[in-house]
Amino acid sequence: MFSWRRGDCESQKEENRSEERKGEETIRFPTRSPFHCVLFLLTDGFVLHKPTASPTVGFSPTIFSFYYSRWESSHRISHDESGFCTAKTPLQDSTFTRHPSTSVPSSPSTPRHSGMDYHQSSSVASSESTASTVAAAAAAAAAASLNQHHHPHLYCDDGLLSRSLTDMVSSGGYDSSSSSLSAAASMCYPTPDAYYYHAPPPPPPPQAQQGFSSTDAWLQMQMQPTYHNFGSTVVSTNSPLPSHLLSYGGQPAFADPFYTIGQSTPNTSSFLDTSNSSFGAPSTVVANPMTNYQLAFQAKLGSLHSLIGDSVQSLTSDRMIDFLSNKEKYECVISIFHAKVAQKSYGNEKRFFCPPPCIYLIGQGWKLKKDRVAQLYKTLKASAQKDAAIENDPIHEQQATELVAYIGIGSDTSERQQLDFSTGKVRHPGDQRQDPNIYDYCAAKTLYISDSDKRKYFDLNAQFFYGCGMEIGGFVSQRIKVISKPSKKKQSMKNTDCKYLCIASGTKVALFNRLRSQTVSTRYLHVEGNAFHASSTKWGAFTIHLFDDERGLQETDNFAVRDGFVYYGSVVKLVDSVTGIALPRLRIRKVDKQQVILDASCSEEPVSQLHKCAFQMIDNELVYLCLSHDKIIQHQATAINEHRHQINDGAAWTIISTDKAEYRFFEAMGQVANPISPCPVVGSLEVDGHGEASRVELHGRDFKPNLKVWFGATPVETTFRSEESLHCSIPPVSQVRNEQTHWMFTNRTTGDVEVPISLVRDDGVVYSSGLTFSYKSLERHGPCRIVSNY
């Protein structure tokens, strides 16, 4: 066993500087794990100087040879003609000092590991030093053969190898003076020539795909991780990927006390940054003999879905009644808020979507779903542990039930952004104050569309799954129009894109302000705690109504509105779509270079997307809605003349139309094996015919043949016509309203029988439609059309 000389970095500073003047070079390498052992390269004439509180120990040169070849192949160390080694990027922490007098120059393509100069402590005999040099030379020859082999190699990260070395040393499983690789092999650890660390290959051209599964994302990573507690093997692509090993889109699911979740993301590793690489790089894996624990998990690979499949039953009326009585307790809601238009980025610029798309997870059903996933995972883990004992790992179980989400443009996976729904993230205090039913929230702040993308319209695609690999599915936004810049000319009402470019009464808008046009100073109008304020993180969707001046001259809670597009000079009412809180009546004015335009000619110009506007108080024409820091105040403008007012930056608001896509579901009969998506969305309901011959036609999207329509707690025969149309019969009132449901479906005011319409999948997943069917309306009006409020 070798013992390397240790020293204090501060005390060695002057010595190192003098050595450098003699032709030696210093290379710094980061260390994260606070091990009590020296775990780093000591070959090719390098000496380690690292402060440590415990006695240092040495390791076989076999393993260290791999470390050096790995650094060299990752282009962090290069050779010059004189045989010196240089680091391209100076790092920090541990210091390695090279002794060129003991080095043997070699070609740049071949790792050099001869002429090693080990500084040993006085406790080590000189004869052992000779044996160590021989062992190092043999190890160097083995490591040098790395470039001569073209067979697949395993990927190993720095944390794994450090733990492997620690286990080997503590167990005394090898002799440091041995020149063979059998010591490591006998310990069931991969030998150095089984590893290969390479630069990521160029990504293939993007391919459109319908779905985004967590398994596909893992297989597309350019560096496949090797798991410590699960053995040293990554399964081959011919066999299914163990979904229980997935965590955070493909990161190792084991618990590492020296690594945090935030240090590893789907496109970065804890050692080599590949943030500039695409997910589409092909992966290289090899199948080595598995450990008992891995074999046990491999045998149980399909057990998670089989456990779910055996327990799934068709939905019962009693369970449906329970769900309809306690929707807040059971239902999971995904709401995607976004702007209706997005500015295109040109060249190297990145115009991030403003306001940023926001995803809200609403309902206590999310906690119930997480608990179910955790229980299934524990059941599977207990099954796999029967043949392979392993200590319980609470951090591992927590990661297995963490919700992982990505969002991107369309089906393209190359520019996806991860959404932070982790348990340990810092929560905004306003989340619960605004709505106690909000489970989680996240904004996608770095999405943009480049000029190379020729699409005129696109949608956002959000993918959800759990760390154990249990997939929830993909959920899309409403359609978004791409624009080059805000329109400066008068919009024509004949324009086919008028509904996107102009703002109509009754639609939702967002308002934001930028001081001195700086992106970092963006503030959004938002409602929190029953009060308006300016937020840098959240934005509100406000319904803008055209106020009918002739019918309502006083400020009241109930006011008359009219349809049509919003023009400058119109009186509008802004109502928060979540809380219902409204601003007083305001007159919308056009803004040009911090001046409000009051010309009568502006009344003929409609308000367009991303226009700058001001909101003038009705009672005092010199007062405007304004923000000051995080507060909303009234700003006193300066009159330049009868046609213009001077305002400050805080009173100039940018207006943009917004939209929302909402999905509601509940796994009524327990966790299901298949993804929740595609989630059907019902847009409207039409009633055809009279009396007993009446039938209902549902219009929407993503309908499937395995869906059945339910009137309250009563299923009815359903005919699938297309993905946009379902037909069904109307059940008799006596069948819908019975002793159990009389109180639930009877309107106490009118006495009418009103039942909610739901779609139910054959495995018990309930999708709420947001529609209610009234039997009295059917008797009075016959055929009719009902539009969903979702």
Curated annotation (Swiss-Prot):
The keyword 4Fe-4S does not apply. It comes from the Eukaryota. Pfam families: BTD, LAG1-DNAbind, TIG_SUH. Residues 343-353, 484-489, 514-519 are annotated as: DNA-binding. It is found in: Nucleus. One of its GO terms (biological process) is oocyte growth. Residues 97-113 have a biased composition (Low complexity). Keywords: DNA-binding, Notch signaling pathway, Nucleus, Transcription, Transcription regulation. In young adults, expressed in germ cells in the distal most ~10 cell diameters of the progenitor zone (PZ), and also in late pachytene, diplotene and diakinesis of oogenesis. Its main location: nucleus. GO terms for molecular function: DNA-binding transcription activator activity, RNA polymerase II-specific; DNA-binding transcription factor activity, RNA polymerase II-specific; double-stranded DNA binding; Notch binding; RNA polymerase II cis-regulatory region sequence-specific DNA binding; sequence-specific DNA binding; transcription coactivator binding. Residues 680-776 form the IPT/TIG domain. Disruption phenotype: RNAi-mediated knockdown ectopically up-regulates expression of hlh-6 outside pharyngeal gland cells. GO terms for cellular component: chromatin; CSL-Notch-Mastermind transcription factor complex; nucleus; RNA polymerase II transcription regulator complex. Component of a complex consisting of at least a lin-12/Notch intracellular domain (NICD), lag-1, and lag-3. An NICD product of lin-12/Notch, including the RBP-j associated molecule (RAM) and ankyrin repeat (ANK) domains, interacts directly with lag-1. Transcriptional regulator that plays a central role in lin-12/Notch and glp-1/Notch signaling pathways, involved in cell-cell communication that regulate a broad spectrum of cell-fate determinations. Binds directly to the 5'-[A/G]TGGGAA-3' DNA consensus sequence, which is present in the regulatory region of several genes. Acts as a transcriptional repressor when it is not associated with Notch proteins. Belongs to the Su(H) family. This is Suppressor of hairless protein homolog. The gene is lag-1.
